[in-house]
């Protein structure tokens, strides 16, 4: 074939991508005769542009998918769009458009960019989660969960802007104010929908043990999030004429500190607090003040602790001491019962609160069985009990058992398990989301919207007018109002992996036959920032679908790879006390005649810049690199090669213009090496090993050593950077042997062909052309992964270590199986060795074949 001796990435990539599209190369169906492999990268939110994080994520997935395809497996790699969410709604408002139009336009742009990367994607399965054909089945499934009593509605705290009359996400609350209008944000209880994930807490916890190919860090994060603990529910009676009917339930994992309780603290939302607020104006004002806090657990952990004394007393269940009851802003209503037994001596939050309000601090646990003054901080470690009456000297476990038994006898305590995990609140007071398919009855209660009315679609008019559909209507003779909340977007991303197995099925949510063929996903790729919410919800949803009979696997993802962040240099200047971040593409470096950097400025400006260091690429620091610019300049294969070569996938990757240029230089060299081989006129022949000289045998051995290493790097270790480095080393050896004869040409060709095959998953476009250049009979897209020829690994020579009186004095190369006498003779004559045995008597020579010789001489 006629080929150019110069590498033109753009023409090569256009041709390859057109071939894949026209031939639907990566469209797959179920095939019982082939082993399946389902490779899935977390699908993107259509923000409008790919960033380098996307490129890295999808390139890693594509390399794995292409490699598995070369192993002969039936490989599915789909792509879709996580299209609902607040950013689209806000962008639509700012741009005076409709979220669906804004999203559709972004999808078109990003799809084109993904295609330009040359990803081996089955585009026939593509969907966006904002399409009614997708969320219809999500709505249907929610109604099934409602019928199975796995869904309920209750009032829950949210961030509320009274001016905008809307709920705000935690990130939209800035210094206690609304990000949009600066009004003071309040905490408000509104009815919201929940799914009972806590029913599956034990299975979600135990299932982590079966996820052998998940990072330990992710599994630890999920264990901590589920947070199973063993403790005691303790009942404290309230001593008050008006409220003596109240009993306060408290859950504690540290019953050994019960004798150190000096007060009780209630959450501002606790029922007793609500009752007191109606009668006590000071408490009502305090609760109102607390309502301005954010509602996230992280905020509670760092909030400045404030409280108010209710004037009520609780009775200690073992000592009958009277304990003051306070309301504290640091108590979470959603953990335990919303009340805590405060032990300032042994809990840091209680300690800080007690110090602030001069409450009693009592030490009841000691690490050395001594009573020490607690002034600086609480003693949170477990030890032996002191100041605890009959429980003195007991260890934690002994005290747990003894106190639990005594409380049980008094009918004031019971051993139980508790979870940090809370039921999943799926309501969002937003327009751009999947509508929750429920009717609220005017008479009270809720009923699901029936299947024949699904999907419940979004009303564009309501968005344009900013209205919520809360008109009364009649359904089956009952007055109802359609639910106006939409689903949390984590709902859509919790089951998309299963829908990809049958995305064009209009008759059912999941086709069990197809789902059971493809699932679980064999390799899932995404950032570790999704370790808790997305990955936990996806595991939960998978089990819900299993219990509905839609699929039969227990877990959604067999193997999980969390790719590292992409880093880049950052630059800024200060203006009015604020840092103004400048894109690296707008930075100019000034050097003196010796090449030393003297200053950094913004291009076409005298403004001097400071370095912000190497940080994660982000909009906030304006240090992102537009991958499309790099593709336009160098081609997609260069971007892919740099991305995979710069670092192992789990580690952070630092962007480098020099690295990109180096990747492009290597591809040009690969093209030149292959071209030189292609123009040689020697006929293609089988290798006759008997005719090969030592240099040719060495190249064959290097070729098959490289195949063995790269196969291990791809399949077991996922260290693609070292695999690429190994191929580069092999090609260096190729250039040392010229195709001056048939035998040299044959072993060079073998090395080059195998190099192309091993690089194909990483740089597929150029490899297609190089493969054709060498006149191979089958397309590379149908070629198998290269196999190691074990016979080629056998060395004809071996290096022998020579010792004199046990000390290493030299090395020689000898033929494998060479005569012992000849080897000993060579050893004695070795230049350095001869100096140490000169004029000495050789008493004996110890010879370990193919390893070492030890010459023992007189001293």
Where are these regions (language model features)?
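Basic, alpha-helical terminal appendages of large translation-related enzymes
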Residues: 1-36, 267-270, 280, 311, ...
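Conserved oxyanion/phosphate-binding beta-strand-loop segments in alpha/beta enzyme cores
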Residues: 1-40, 69-78, 101-111, 213, ...
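NTP-handling and nucleic-acid-processing catalytic cores
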Residues: 2-18, 138-361, 366, 475, ...
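Long, charged, mostly alpha-helical binding arms that flank functional sites
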Residues: 3-5, 229-233, 366-369, 373-416, ...
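Residue patterns forming the tRNA-binding/recognition surfaces of aminoacyl-tRNA synthetases
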Residues: 15, 19-23, 94-248, 255-256, ...
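N-terminal catalytic cores of NTP/NDP-binding nucleotidyl/phosphoryl-transfer enzymes
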Residues: 28-97, 126-141, 252-253, 317-353, ...
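Acidic, turn-prone loop/beta-hairpin segments
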Residues: 82, 438-442, 446-451, 560, ...
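Flexible, glycine/threonine-enriched loop-and-boundary segments that flank and lead into catalytic domains
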Residues: 217-249, 294-321, 325, 424, ...
């Amino acid at each position: 074939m006629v080929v150019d001796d110069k590498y033109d990435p753009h023409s090569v990539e256009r041709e390859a991508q057109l071939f894949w599209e026209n031939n639907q190369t990566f469209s797959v169906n179920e095939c019982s005769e082939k082993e399946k492999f389902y490779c899935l990268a977390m699908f993107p939110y259509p923000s409008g542009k790919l960033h380098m994080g996307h490129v890295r994520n999808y390139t890693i997935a594509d390399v794995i998918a292409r490699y598995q395809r070369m192993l002969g497996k039936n490989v599915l790699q789909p792509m879709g769009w996580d299209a609902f969410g607040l950013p689209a709604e806000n962008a639509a408002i700012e741009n005076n458009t409709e979220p669906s139009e804004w999203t559709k336009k972004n999808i078109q742009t990003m799809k084109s960019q993904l295609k330009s990367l040359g990803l081996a994607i089955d585009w026939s399965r593509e969907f966006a989660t904002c399409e009614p054909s997708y969320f219809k089945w999500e709505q249907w499934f929610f109604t099934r969960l409602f019928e199975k009593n796995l869904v309920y509605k209750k009032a829950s705290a949210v961030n509320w802007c009274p001016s905008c009359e809307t709920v705000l996400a935690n990130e939209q609350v800035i210094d206690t104010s609304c990000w949009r209008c600066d009004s003071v944000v309040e905490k408000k209880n509104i009815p919201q929908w929940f799914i009972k994930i806590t029913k599956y807490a034990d299975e979600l916890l135990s299932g982590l043990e079966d996820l052998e190919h998940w990072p330990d860090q992710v599994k630890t994060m999920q264990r901590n999030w589920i947070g199973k603990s063993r403790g005691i529910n303790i009942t404290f009676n309230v001593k008050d004429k008006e409220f003596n009917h109240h009993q306060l339930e408290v859950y504690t994992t540290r019953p050994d500190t019960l004798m150190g309780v000096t007060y009780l603290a209630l959450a501002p939302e606790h029922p007793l607090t609500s009752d007191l607020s109606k009668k006590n104006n000071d408490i009502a004002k305090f609760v109102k003040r607390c309502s301005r806090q954010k509602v996230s657990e992280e905020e509670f952990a760092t909030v400045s602790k404030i409280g108010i004394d209710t004037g009520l007393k609780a009775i200690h269940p073992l000592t009958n001491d009277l304990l003051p009851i306070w309301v504290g802003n640091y108590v979470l209503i959603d953990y335990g019962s919303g009340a805590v037994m405060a032990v300032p001596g042994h809990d840091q939050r209680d300690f800080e609160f007690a110090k602030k309000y001069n409450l009693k601090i009592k030490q009841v646990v000691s690490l050395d069985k001594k009573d020490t003054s607690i002034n600086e901080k609480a003693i949170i470690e477990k030890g032996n009990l002191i100041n605890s009456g009959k429980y003195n000297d007991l260890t934690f476990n002994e005290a747990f058992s003894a106190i639990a038994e005594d409380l049980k006898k008094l009918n004031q305590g019971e051993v139980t398990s508790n979870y940090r995990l809370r039921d999943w609140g799926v309501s969002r007071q937003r327009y751009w989301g999947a509508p929750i398919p429920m009717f609220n009855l005017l008479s009270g209660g809720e009923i699901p919207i029936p299947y024949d009315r699904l999907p419940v679609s979004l009303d564009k008019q309501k968005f344009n007018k900013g209205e919520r559909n809360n008109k009364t209507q009649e359904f089956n003779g009952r007055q109802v109002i359609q639910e106006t909340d939409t689903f949390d977007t984590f709902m859509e991303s919790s089951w998309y992996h299963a829908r990809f197995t049958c995305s064009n099925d209009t008759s059912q949510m999941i086709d069990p036959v197809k789902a059971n063929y493809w699932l679980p996903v064999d390799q899932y790729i995404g950032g570790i920032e999704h370790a808790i919410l997305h990955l936990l919800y996806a595991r939960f949803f998978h089990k819900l679908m299993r219990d509905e009979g839609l699929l039969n696997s227990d877990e959604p993802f067999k193997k999980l790879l969390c790719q590292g962040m992409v880093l880049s240099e950052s630059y800024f200047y200060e203006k009015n006390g604020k840092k103004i971040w400048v894109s690296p593409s707008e930075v100019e470096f000034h050097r003196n005649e010796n090449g030393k950097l003297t200053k950094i400025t913004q291009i076409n400006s005298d403004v001097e810049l400071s370095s912000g260091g190497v940080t994660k690429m982000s909009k906030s620091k304006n240090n992102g690199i537009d991958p499309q610019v790099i593709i336009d300049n160098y081609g997609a294969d260069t971007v892919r090669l740099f991305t995979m070569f710069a670092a192992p996938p789990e580690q952070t990757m630092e962007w480098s213009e020099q690295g990109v240029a180096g990747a492009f230089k290597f591809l040009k060299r690969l093209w030149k090496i292959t071209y030189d081989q292609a123009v040689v006129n020697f006929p293609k022949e089988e290798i006759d090993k008997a005719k090969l000289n030592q240099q040719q045998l060495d190249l064959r051995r290097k070729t098959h050593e490289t195949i063995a290493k790269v196969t291990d790097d791809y399949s077991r270790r996922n260290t693609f950077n070292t695999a690429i480095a190994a191929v580069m080393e092999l090609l260096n050896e190729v250039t040392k042997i010229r195709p001056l004869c048939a035998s040299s040409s044959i072993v060079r060709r073998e090395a080059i062909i195998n190099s192309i095959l091993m690089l194909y998953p990483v740089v597929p476009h150029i490899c297609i052309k190089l493969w054709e250049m060498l006149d191979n009979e089958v397309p590379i897209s149908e070629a198998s992964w290269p196999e190691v020829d074990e016979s080629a690994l056998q060395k004809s020579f071996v290096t022998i270590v020579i010792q004199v009186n046990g000390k290493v004095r030299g090395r020689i190369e000898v033929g494998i199986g060479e005569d012992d006498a000849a080897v000993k003779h060579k050893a004695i004559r070795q230049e350095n060795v001869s100096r140490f045995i000169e004029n000495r008597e050789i008493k004996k020579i110890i010879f370990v074949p193919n390893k070492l010789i030890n010459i023992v001489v007189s001293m």
